[in-house]
Amino acid sequence: ASDYFGLPDSVTVAVEDGRAYLAASEERFDVIMVDAYQDITIPFQLSSVEFFTEVQRHLKPNGVMVVNLNMTSAENGSINEYLCDTMASVFKYTVTAPVKGNTNTEVFCTDADDWEETFLRSIGNLTDCDYADMMRTVHEKLTPYEGGACILTDDKAPVEVLGMRVLDELIGDELKYYKDELKTGGLSALLGG
């Protein structure tokens, strides 16, 4: 992981199920990164109020959970909405930022009242100008997330069904392209002729 992500040796990386790791640890962290969600492959045990509460318990007082959502759906009742509503039900502050050039959304969750001032101060302390510029861009795109009623729990986490909705949307989008090509150019357009 250190080689792949270019992390310095001072960063500790644990590669295992995040919930199991946290359950066995009393350690607290400044940042916990969760990167486990991709369209239809959503681990239910990393999607519930109970999981996000466990993450919250392992954050230092000014700590932040950063979640990478690699999802294409932003529809009402989507897996994105369920995950963000669930996070917002646990943390005092939840903000999102779209990632330029792809379908990812970064979600930042914290209980620190001064999170934005801390974020800006941290950017000001960066010595890598490119990284500082990128983080300023992220800050400009941050949008507060107001939680709703779509909450996932250990007892109710229909992530497979929600993932299938995403798959249906993906297939529908692909089929629309081919239907449009067939309507405008006929069969020869589809066959490249």
Locate predicted features.
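Short catalytic-loop micro-motif centered on adjacent basic/acidic residues
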Residues: 66-68, 95-96
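The AdoMet/dcAdoMet-binding core of the Class I SAM-like
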Residues: 1-64, 70, 74-80, 88, ...
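Soluble small-group transferase modules, centered on the S-adenosyl donor enzyme superfamily
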Residues: 93-193
